[in-house]
């Protein structure tokens, strides 16, 4: 009897897809640090990294070697188990969240009916990594940064979820592929769910702790925040994890609001991966542009903005969407 039954082949293909996608995401996250430095230099009218290799292209290799050979030091006053666990949880939660992203009609790790809920579960898990890092470091700046990060992340995840409820109401599903196919038959959600898009994008920047919402690791205030005591590859996992978060939020924006792998007006459907990659790259550049152009507000202003602006906006968007869906739903006679 052959071991290669259709079920076994499906499992093998799923594992291969998962390995390829996760390796590609990790490599892209590492390369994104170099791309960001070059773009920031270009936009700010200065040189970026330009010494190592042609156009500074090997700078990322030099940085990785430096990080790899640095001493993996753990402070003697830290809780060593939790201190080591925190960067692992931070990076793995973001990588696992990529399982629900449909890159093309055939490429994706898992086609879950609760795809959106799975994403929020993994996003919530990353909050524990930040709390673990700040608490286990036994450092007042790290603890204050972790408390800032957890409060900010939990607050903006509320609005991130509410921003997507309008899409769920219209599609009637939490499945990511169902959402993409709905947009292929109708308008991309950037038009009917524009308020939801704005709130989701703002919340995405805040959840990834990117500028201008990088108060949890503000160098001028907290001396690098919750990962101040980290060095070597542990710090590198936090560092690369931040860029993986940028890629994840950008891919979600493309999937949920910009038609996923579909081109505009159904142009060149055979180039599904190219369309997905181009749209994701656009939002990644938008993240970097925000860092280059916007100052950092105070922490209390960030929290006030979340509850006084984002919450009313998401609730209004959800109410309008529900009213429109009910209006367009044909009445059913009660027997």
Swiss-Prot record:
It catalyses: a quinone + NADH + 5 H(+)(in) = a quinol + NAD(+) + 4 H(+)(out). It comes from the Bacteria. One of its GO terms (cellular component) is plasma membrane. It is found in: Cell inner membrane. It is an enzyme of class 7 (translocase). GO terms for molecular function: NADH dehydrogenase activity; oxidoreductase activity, acting on NAD(P)H, quinone or similar compound as acceptor; quinone binding. Disulfide bonds: none annotated. Pfam families: NADHdh. The chain crosses the membrane at residues 11-31, 81-101, 114-134, 154-174, 187-207, 238-258, 270-290, 307-327. NDH-1 is composed of 13 different subunits. Subunits NuoA, H, J, K, L, M, N constitute the membrane sector of the complex. Belongs to the complex I subunit 1 family. This is NADH-quinone oxidoreductase subunit H. It comes from Pseudomonas fluorescens (strain ATCC BAA-477 / NRRL B-23932 / Pf-5). The gene is nuoH.
